[in-house]
Amino acid sequence: MGFKVVRAAGVDTDLELINDHLFESYVDLGDPISEAVDRAAARVRSIETDMEALMHSPYQGTLSPQITPGLRHVTKDKAIFYFEVDNVRQIVLILAVFFSGQDHEQRILERLGRT
């Protein structure tokens, strides 16, 4: 049996924020609103596909033991995924998804209550 990807509570909000950011960026760059909506939604779907693909190679990415033991992060097409792997339960727990030029290390520290 393979690993299962599980989203922590804040991940859906992360994806909504990314969607909003992308939508605003596309509109600012001149896209019509309907096209900006479609492009942002497609990009978020792509991020979700990349997130689900972590089930196939759960031990990829960089360990971040300075933040918390077992924490990993990996960047895929400008989306940064923070996650933990539970080998016993065969779960990849997605803790956060950040996008592009954000200070993602500071943001994960805040998310985990370490600041």
Please provide the spans of the model-predicted regions.
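Structured catalytic/translocation cores of nucleotide/phosphate-coupled proteins
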Residues: 34-37, 67, 115
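Enriched for short, Lys/Arg-rich terminal
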Residues: 71-80, 84-115
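Arg/Lys-rich, positively charged N-terminal/basic patches that mediate binding to nucleic acids
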Residues: 1-44
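GIY-YIG nuclease signature motif recognition
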Residues: 11, 47, 83
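A short, surface-exposed loop/turn module that caps and links secondary-structure elements
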Residues: 48-75
